[in-house]
């Protein structure tokens, strides 16, 4: 039992503490001061900073201010001293007319805490007003037969002060006929009355002059006076009388002007003139005198001003009725003004935030509203609400204050601003309402990154584009605003084929337009993968990226390239072999071409552009195969020239041509045997070119022969000295020229021959045109005297088997040397023996030529007739290892067949693909031609 009892006691103490804390907090928010009226402006009322628990400097820092009420501000805050001071002269009588306690209320707002403190200031009365009479002079008529002790009302004095400073007493100037008596009303008012003490005699004195003095209880005492003149009349023995001592009326405040409220009525028993009664206000305040009017004849009270319950809800007046004899009666008139719902509620914004961040938490204060209705009772009861489905709510605060706060977290991207309508409605009939509109902007925060409308972008650009051309425009959207929506575009770093991406494309950081910095080549690369980044300027900045695929479109900017037959570098033309026994459709060769473009631009077609024998050959449109169109006849020329065109399908189409020379023969030796009688087709342009070449070479030869003759003439003087040398060379008669050529000389001669000896392709007869001789040293071989040297060429050839007219060798001329640039070899670059001499007669020249052709025939037939081993150019075994075909260029590139475009091909290189026996040539696949 004891623990349970202690628990109940403890619980009661806790509840009592909570209740006391609540009462203390409520009391702390109400501050009271007292101040006398009529203080000068700036007079101290109270230390508001101390009562708020603040330092004076904190008043401004924390936003402490007085919430204004009405147009006139009576008080102000002194930020230096922290005091509440008067803002002007305070007149208690003007503010609180007739009120016993004059109390002024004001509200002080502490903005940082959004807390309101109520302040009550009691204005104490001082004796600043003297009593006064509205009429400074008054005339009273009294019948001479008036009875003593008859009372006559005197004018009432006014004193706006209260308490002891208000009206306290009346005094009448001394006289023998009258005295003064003061009546106290129910409300504490004092009404002076004149009492007749001694009977009047008009004949003795027709008028009496009195002075009525009103005094207050202030210190010092203030007084007011009124002069009274008493006129003595003839006898009238009856006074008027009101039907009732008090008249009451309740009227609504919205009455129209001139409306009759009530009628007072008084009667006089006298007759005639003495019975006539006139009505007047005996007592009425200033406000009532401006609102009500009393008809002096009828006693009707009507309105001459607008009634306002909020200004004054009750009026009290005193009327009197007086006959001609001066007798009077009085009655009270009480008028109650009923309230009607004629005032709509008033809404005052005491604090307002123009904008609120969109990420503000729920319950953020937007505005502080003060709601008031001047009506009373239900007409003054107000309810507030927000129109529409808005994310805000009103919370009841201190007194008539409401707080407008957010109900959810706002999002500027959904709703950037709100027009809030706060409606205040009273409970009157009919109810009146007031709408207050609040415009609220939602401040943006950077909570949205830029967004691209597409997940990825693709752009196409033809190759060979000009630099600086725009490729594509990418645009991102940021739902934010201002700086948070300003987007900067950039490209992610990347490397393409070893080069930075920035060397190929760039992007405008403001517009997002992508530009080409270089001209693209489809054959180099066909697409670019670019990552575009969009970043806003918020804090912190947000970004997003998108992939951009840039495809390069092919253009027909590459002509077909012919891979086979390849164009020789030495100016010769390849020869394809077609046996005379070939049937129609026989595959002679195949033109192979490629195009570096793609698609339709790389589709190739082949056609026979020109042929020396039309109808003999055909070219496959898509394969490029050159086949015989019919059987070969004996009348068909040995050499057939074909021009094959290869064309792509681009726009515009590009093409390339190749010239093929087809030898109609069964073998290479047959081709060489028939070269002497080969006739080329007439071609005016080629014939002219050949003529020019013949004339040029003939001129050079003539100059050379003249030079040789000059040298021979100079050597006649030394003829006798050379007899011994000639005698020693007599045993060489009948020896072939090939036995006099040394290894080094042949090598140098062949190299020079390969570059400087040319055979015209279309001459009417076969000619060998030799440039200026450039011979190497010659060696004598005794071992080869016994052998004969057959020659391959016949007919009109300049070579002959019987060329033995001059077999003696002139002595070497050691003074005639050639510079390094004049020596045999390609452009004089071959190394030779600086001590050798050159043949200086026609015999040696012809023998060397015969040796070259014999060696060529030997290599073509795969056998040697000069006694040398394989690949030794027919030289003896003594010189074979030192000079082989591996040390010199392929003769098939250097020896031309006169009168044709063909070069010598290895006789062993048949279509069967077998290599010649004992040869060192390369092996070719079956069905392929060896092209040099």
UniProtKB/Swiss-Prot annotation:
The keyword Transmembrane applies. One of its GO terms (biological process) is cell adhesion. It is a single-pass type I membrane protein. The chain crosses the membrane at residues 693-713. GO terms for cellular component: cell-cell junction; plasma membrane. Residues 816-841 have a biased composition (Polar residues). It is found in: Cell membrane. InterPro entries: Cadherin-like_dom, Cadherin-like_sf, Cadherin_C, Cadherin_CBD, Cadherin_CS, Cadherin_N, Protocadherin/Cadherin-CA. This is Protocadherin gamma-A12. It comes from Homo sapiens. The lineage of its organism: Eukaryota, Metazoa, Chordata, Craniata, Vertebrata.
């Amino acid at each position: 039992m004891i623990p349970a009892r202690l628990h109940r006691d403890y619980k009661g103490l806790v509840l009592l503490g909570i209740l006391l804390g609540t009462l203390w907090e409520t009391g702390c928010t109400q501050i009271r001061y007292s101040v006398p009226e009529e203080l000068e402006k700036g007079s101290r009322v109270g230390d508001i900073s101390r009562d708020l628990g603040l330092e004076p400097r904190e008043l401004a820092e924390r936003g402490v201010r007085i919430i204004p009420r009405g147009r006139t501000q009576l008080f102000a805050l002194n930020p230096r001293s922290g005091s509440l001071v008067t803002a002007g002269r305070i007149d208690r009588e003007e503010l609180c007319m007739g009120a016993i306690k004059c109390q002024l209320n004001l509200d002080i707002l502490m903005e940082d805490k959004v807390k309101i403190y109520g302040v009550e200031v009691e204005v104490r009365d001082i004796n600043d007003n003297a009593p006064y009479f509205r009429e400074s002079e008054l005339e009273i008529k009294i019948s001479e037969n008036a009875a003593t002790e008859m009372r006559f009302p005197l004018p009432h004095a006014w004193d706006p002060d209260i308490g002891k400073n208000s009206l306290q007493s009346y005094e009448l100037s001394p006289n023998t006929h009258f005295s003064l008596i003061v009546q106290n009303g129910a409300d504490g008012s004092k009404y002076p009355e004149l009492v007749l003490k001694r009977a009047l005699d008009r004949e003795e004195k027709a008028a009496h002059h009195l002075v009525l003095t009103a005094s207050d209880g202030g210190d010092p005492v203030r007084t007011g006076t009124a002069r009274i003149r008493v006129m003595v009349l003839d006898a009238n023995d009856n006074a008027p009388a009101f039907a009732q001592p008090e008249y009451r009326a309740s009227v609504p405040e919205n009455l129209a002007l001139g409306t009759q409220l009530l009628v007072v009525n008084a009667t006089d028993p006298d007759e005639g003139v003495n019975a006539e009664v006139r009505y007047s206000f005996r007592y009425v305040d200033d406000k009532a005198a401006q609102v009500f009017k009393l008809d002096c004849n009828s006693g009707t009270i009507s309105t001459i001003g607008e009634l306002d319950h909020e200004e004054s809800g009750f009026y009290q007046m005193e009327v009197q009725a007086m006959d001609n004899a001066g007798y009077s009666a009085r009655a009270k008139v009480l008028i109650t003004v009923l309230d009607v719902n004629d005032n709509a509620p008033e809404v005052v914004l005491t604090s307002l935030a123009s904008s609120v961040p969109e990420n503000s938490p729920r319950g953020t204060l937007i505005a502080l509203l003060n709601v008031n209705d001047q009506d009373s009772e239900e007409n003054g009861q107000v309810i507030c609400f927000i129109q529409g489905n808005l994310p805000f709510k009103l919370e009841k605060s201190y007194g008539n204050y409401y707080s407008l706060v957010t109900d959810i977290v706002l999002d500027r991207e959904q709703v950037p601003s709100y027009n809030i309508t706060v409606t205040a409605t009273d409970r009157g009939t009919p109810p009146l309402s007031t709408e207050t509109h609040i415009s609220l902007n939602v401040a943006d925060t950077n909570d949205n990154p830029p967004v691209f409308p597409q997940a990825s972008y693709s752009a196409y650009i033809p190759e060979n584009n000009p630099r600086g051309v725009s490729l594509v425009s990418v645009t991102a959207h940021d739902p934010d605003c201002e700086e948070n929506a300003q987007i900067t575009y950039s490209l992610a770093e990347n490397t393409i084929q070893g080069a930075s991406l920035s060397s190929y494309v760039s992007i405008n950081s403001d517009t997002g337009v992508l530009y080409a910095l270089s001209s693209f080549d489809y054959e180099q690369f066909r697409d670019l993968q670019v990552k575009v980044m969009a970043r806003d300027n918020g804090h912190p900045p947000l970004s997003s990226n998108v992939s951009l695929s840039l495809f390069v479109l092919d253009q027909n900017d590459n002509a077909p390239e012919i891979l086979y037959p390849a164009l020789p570098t030495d100016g010769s033309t390849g020869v394809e072999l077609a046996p005379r026994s070939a049937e129609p459709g026989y595959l002679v060769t195949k033109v192979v071409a490629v195009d570096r473009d793609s698609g339709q631009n790389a589709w190739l077609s082949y056609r026979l552009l020109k042929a020396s024998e039309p109808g003999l050959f055909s070219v496959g449109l898509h394969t490029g195969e050159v086949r015989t169109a019919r059987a070969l006849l004996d009348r068909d020329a040995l050499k057939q020239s074909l021009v094959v065109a290869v064309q792509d399908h681009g726009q515009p189409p590009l093409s390339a041509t190749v010239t093929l020379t087809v030898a109609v023969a069964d073998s290479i030796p047959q081709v060489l045997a028939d070269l002497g009688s080969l006739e080329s087709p007439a071609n005016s342009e080629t014939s002219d070119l050949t003529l020019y070449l013949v004339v040029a070479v003939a001129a050079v030869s003539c100059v050379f022969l003249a030079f040789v003759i000059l040298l021979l003439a100079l050597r006649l003087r030394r003829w006798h000295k050379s007899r011994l040398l000639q005698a020693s060379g007599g045993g060489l008669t009948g020896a072939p020229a090939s036995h006099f050529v040394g290894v080094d000389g042949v090598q140098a001669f062949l190299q020079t021959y390969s570059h400087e000896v040319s055979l015209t392709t279309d001459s009417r007869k076969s000619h060998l045109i030799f440039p200026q001789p450039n011979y190497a040293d010659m060696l004598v071989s005794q071992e080869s005297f016994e052998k004969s040297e057959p020659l391959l060429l016949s007919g009109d050839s300049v070579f002959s088997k019987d060329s033995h007219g001059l077999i003696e060798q002139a002595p070497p001329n050691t003074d005639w040397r050639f510079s390094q640039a004049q020596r045999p070899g390609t452009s004089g670059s071959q190394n030779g023996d600086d001590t050798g001499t050159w043949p200086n007669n026609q015999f040696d020249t012809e023998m060397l030529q015969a040796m070259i052709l014999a060696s060529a025939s030997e290599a073509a037939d795969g056998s040697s007739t000069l006694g040398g081993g394989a690949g030794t150019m027919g030289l003896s075994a003594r010189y074979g290892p030192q000079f082989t075909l591996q040390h010199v260029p392929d003769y098939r590139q250097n020896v031309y067949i006169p009168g044709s475009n063909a070069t010598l091909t290895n006789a062993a290189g048949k279509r069967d693909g077998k290599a010649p026996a004992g040869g060192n040539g390369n092996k070719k696949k079956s069905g392929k031609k060896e092209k040099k």
